Amino acid sequence: MGTPPGLQTDCEALLSRFQETDSVRFEAFTELWRNMKFGTIFCGRMRNLEKNMFTKEALALAWRYFLPPYTFQIRVGALYLLYGLYNTQLCQPKQKIRVALKDWDEVLKFQQDLVNAQHFDAAYIFRKLRLDRAFHFTAMPKLLSYRMKKKIHRAEVTEEFKDPSDRVMKLITSDVLEEMLNVHDHYQNMKRVISVDKSKPDKALSLIKDDFFDNIKNIVLEHQQWHKDRKNPSLKSKINDGEEKMEGNSQETERCERAESLAKIKSKAFSVVIQASKSRRHRQVKLDSSDCDSASGQGQVKATRKKEKKERLKPAGRKMSFRNKGNVQNIHKEDKPLSLSMPVITEEENESLSGTEFTASKKKRKH
């Protein structure tokens, strides 16, 4: 959806009338707002979808005049227009003002200019919008989508509201500076002619400073450089980064020199080694040998203690009888999974079985 017909014309008419007042006060803007009945711009039979789209377009149009290259007065009027449109809209919830992140730095600079110029009514309006969370921060100024058009329509800048690039340079050109220099030289020569001493003019005739032209020239050059830095802040940041790098390199060289001096001092200190006397060496060796003996003795004691613990923890199976061993083996066999092999009968079991069969046959005979 494009800009609704008549909306841009009405906004420009309101801003042009505000420009004619030659003021940035909020009272002057509200008077024009009431006279034009601008609050009824959202009235009419519209569905919710159309209402939301119309409000978005109105806020986007007003935001366009809030950014450069428009004059300071037009930007203040656009701020008041945004405030009025945001608070008189009929959408629920309210549509927010779409702000691209790349434009936010310029907005903060404008806020600081308002505070420095003591335009507190405009600064209050901007702060009120921020507190009401009227801004919707986005990556791009417009909502992007897939388009088949090769050429994208760009908004035209209104020349009436546009801020001149540099008024100082238009006023003081190179021709004007040259003419001022000629006038200044002629003035100095005339003072010498009138004065008694032809080499030096009288002090009574020195109504202006001798370096008047040089001061004007330096001021113009400083203003020109400031204007360039304002247009291209990246160049200024690069210059500052270069200065910081130079300072960092100088600090690194100082650190390297300190480190080298400390290394030299340490090398000198450790190069001179104090040798101990023979008696001390002998004592030291003895002490080392005693330490080794004590360490070996402690190791042997630990080994014997470990052996004793192992002997204590040995199972009492050695004291068990042969039958108990058999029972233990049978218990372990029961724990194991069943196998399909035939059972193995030992000799002792054969003897016991034969004995039981013999006694059983004797009892039968007795009966």
UniProtKB/Swiss-Prot annotation:
Natural source organism: Macaca fascicularis (Crab-eating macaque)
Domain of life: Eukaryota
Subunit structure of this chain's protein: Part of the SNAPc complex composed of 5 subunits: SNAPC1, SNAPC2, SNAPC3, SNAPC4 and SNAPC5. SNAPC1 interacts with SNAPC3, SNAPC4 and TBP.
Region (Disordered): 228-254, 278-367
One GO cellular component term: nucleoplasm
Basic and acidic residues: compositionally biased ranges: 238-254
Protein name as annotated: snRNA-activating protein complex subunit 1
Record gene name: SNAPC1
Biased composition (Polar residues): 292-301
UniProt-recorded Gene Ontology molecular function terms: sequence-specific DNA binding
Modification sites for Phosphoserine: 289-290
Function statement: Part of the SNAPc complex required for the transcription of both RNA polymerase II and III small-nuclear RNA genes. Binds to the proximal sequence element (PSE), a non-TATA-box basal promoter element common to these 2 types of genes. Recruits TBP and BRF2 to the U6 snRNA TATA box.
Chain residue ranges for the region called SNAPC4-binding: 164-268
InterPro entries: SNAPC1
